[in-house]
Amino acid sequence: MNFETVIGLEVHVELKTKSKIFSSSPTPFGAAANTQTSVIDLGYPGVLPVLNKEAVNFAMKAAMALNCEIATDTKFDRKNYFYPDNPKAYQISQFDKPIGENGWIEIEVGGKTKRIGITRLHLEEDAGKLTHTGDGYSLVDYNRQGTPLVEIVSEPDIRTPEEAYAYLEKLKSIIQYTGVSDCKMEEGSLRCDANISLRPIGQEEFGTKTELKNLNSFAFVQKGLEHEEKRQAQVLLSGGVIQQETRRYDEASKTTILMRVKEGSDDYRYFPEPDLVELYIDDEWKQRVKDSIPELPDERRKRYIEELGLPAYDAKVLTLTKEMSDFFEAAVEKGADAKLASNWLMGEVSAYLNAQQKELADVELTPEGLAGLVKLIEKGTISSKIAKKVFKELIEKGGDAEKIVKEKGLVQISDEATLRKLVTEALDNNPQSIEDFKNGKDRAIGFLVGQIMKASKGQANPPMVNKLLLEEINKR
């Protein structure tokens, strides 16, 4: 029997507001434990929540960017459960009237475009953070308690773990472009739970789903889903029954492990939040938020192809993160050739960042620095080999490319007389290479060019060297 996989994702995104959703407590990341909280966050008796309007604006902005319909009437509800990181024993969330519904985004997998529906986007407060010591007790930090979140729930339209990865990448990219969140999984500002079930191909009814947690990277999401897909298939093929449960992905064993039997929404006993009035969002408010949405990745990608003449692949890679795209834009504004700047960002820059496990904000390279380097290559002032030396200096120490080239004497040698002398010396020292080339061994030219580049410390102009080599060989 063959099965169809059905996947739905629940993504929690922390909003980048200066204060919490229902109190004036600040929201910086990395502060000392329990220093960014208040009596409202901790649910002391007699205190009342006050809704942060900016959190509503940010939620609307995210929902609009995800093509959601924005509610005119919305409200907050209490989600009742007890856990040490939830001091009030309830979470203020949205149940039956979310701020956004019926959205969608498009993903690309295997060269094909697919639309993934978004069921809803709703506002809620985050919980605190538990740290398990392993010594029989846990520590709780309430700094995160009350931080504004949006929960984005996809339709069960995802059919493969690869599609799930693509969906998360696209969702993160869109949210980052809006500016409402930095979406850093390592800091907890983007978290994901996955629901997965299998059903026989052709069957309309969904199978019993399991929920996956502890997915702290997109790669873990994909790996966890791949394992769960195999596990469920094995259970079903052996005549077993899938239980509705919550499992976690364990990287060490590369398996999913049972955490608990899954609760349904009824277990939370939702009811309207009595301390907050219903929220009315009129058309004027919606329009103001809509007007504040910047250019999104798909729009920017299209512009790069149509206006800058970039290949579709370049445009896709450059627009995947707002940081890279903004850097590219700034470099082009400073006079860099678009294609050359794209090549450097996708090549040398990305390779360096990956090797060092850094982001663009962590290095000394600036858009002006990259633009200066690209312009020197365009003018023929430096060769591509020398450019790599200059690049290393720029990304590690910063500075001006032209100044570095002059100070270090790295200007490309393009003087014909100087180059002809180097060519003559190389030919005199390597008569066998001349014979090899004349006998059809084209690699001999590459060897001779290498000798000249070595003699010139990489500063000889390669195209001119090739031209002069052929001229001199033909004379012999």
Curated annotation (Swiss-Prot):
Entry keyword Ligase: yes
Keyword Nuclease annotated: no
Gene Ontology biological process: glutaminyl-tRNAGln biosynthesis via transamidation; translation
Enzyme Commission numbers on file: 6.3.5.-
GO molecular function, one term: asparaginyl-tRNA synthase (glutamine-hydrolyzing) activity
Enzymatic reactions: L-glutamyl-tRNA(Gln) + L-glutamine + ATP + H2O = L-glutaminyl-tRNA(Gln) + L-glutamate + ADP + phosphate + H(+); L-aspartyl-tRNA(Asn) + L-glutamine + ATP + H2O = L-asparaginyl-tRNA(Asn) + L-glutamate + ADP + phosphate + 2 H(+)
InterPro entries assigned to the protein according to its UniProt record, in alphabetical order: Asn/Gln-tRNA_amidoTrfase_suB/E (IPR017959), Asn/Gln-tRNA_Trfase_suB/E_cat (IPR006075), Asn/Gln_amidotransferase (IPR018027), Asn/Gln_tRNA_amidoTrase-B-like (IPR003789), GatB (IPR004413), GatB_C_1 (IPR042114), GatB_Yqey_C_2 (IPR023168), Gln-tRNA_amidoTrfase_suB_CS (IPR017958)
Enzyme class: ligase
Record's keyword terms, sorted: ATP-binding, Ligase, Nucleotide-binding, Protein biosynthesis
A Pfam cross-reference name: GatB_Yqey
Family: Belongs to the GatB/GatE family. GatB subfamily.
Descriptive protein name: Aspartyl/glutamyl-tRNA(Asn/Gln) amidotransferase subunit B
